[in-house]
Amino acid sequence: MRAIILVVLSFLVLSFLFGPAWSDDTMDCNYVSFGEYDYTDVSTNLPTRNNNPGNIRKTKVTYFGETTNESGFESFAAPEWGYAAMFDLLDRLYTGLTLSEAIYKWAPPVENDTEKYVRFVAKKTGYDRNEYKVNVNDESIIEFAKWMSVLEGMKGFSDDDVSFGYMVWDKCYSATVEMDDE
């Protein structure tokens, strides 16, 4: 409940500062960003430059807020779009998996220290690695995605970026968008 209140208050402040992203209770899924971001500095890491907190690889799926780049990873206009894509991917391909199963699928041991990743996310969220089930319709997913993005290398983001990403997912993806699985 506290998270919902925080998200609503943050949204109201940003709507006042940057103008509304919603009209008639519908989000404009073609807006660019709530804030102004410039992550073109090559000294920042790839997930941060690409506003891609989940370090999502390019596939045939087209995401809202997607931009073009030359790397093998998706890039987005702002962090909230990257988080929305992350929530979409978790929803479509990870729902019902335990925390451990989801992270082993997201970050396989071939490329990652997956066990360390699982322990980190479980510790930071307080979720049991074998009991917590991925469910994007439960706001506990916000903390899950936040700590995943930390291990994926996202820097300079805020809790608001994660929460806005969840709102973007809710308005632009959930139950409204039919997308092919990867």
What are these regions (language model features)?
Residues 1-4:
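Positively charged n-region of N-terminal signal peptides that target proteins for export
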Residues 19-182:
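Cell-wall polysaccharide-cleaving catalytic domain and substrate-binding groove, primarily
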Residues 8-16:
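Bacterial N-terminal signal peptides
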